Amino acid sequence: MKKYTFYIIGLMALVFGSCANQESVTVEKNTEKPFFDVKGFFESEIAESKLTKIEKTVRINGESETQILTEFDLNKELSIFLNSDINKPSLFDKYNTFETEFSTTYKTTDKELNVQRIKIFKDKNGDFLKILINRKADTQIYTSDKALTYEPNVGYTIKNAQKVLLSDKKDYEIEVKFQ
């Protein structure tokens, strides 16, 4: 009988212990972003886009070619903007913020970072007007300076000055007008 009593007490402890009011622990991920959400902004622009065609002009060292495209992947077209996000925990202390009435600028002094500066322009109502992004890549093989400009419902421009080791400097510009 003592043997069964031990099992019954153990079973009751297990049943009542599992029914006890337990405090749940919630671990919240820090989703606050200290800088303008570049990636989220462009994901939203892509998702809400109703574009049916774009006019794309490519200029390389002064020569240009223009095409009207009705088949295009806006996600690929804007990928360089999507990849300019600075809201990563490892970058939180790498950028300084400068604000004026109509603009916010995020700038780094770290020459190793690809995104050197982001400047967002808004009108007096706080509506988004334009974003400028300066990217830099500097390796032993090449250097590249890119100036990106995006205007909602208007289009975007990518200007690049690139110098590859043992070759001439190459400038190119991509201008896309939304239609």
Stretches found by the model and what they are:
Residues V27-S49:
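Post-signal peptide N-terminal segment of mature Sec-exported envelope proteins
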Residues E45-K124:
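Surface-exposed acidic loop/strand-edge motifs in secreted or periplasmic proteins
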Residues F6-L11:
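Sec-dependent N-terminal signal peptides
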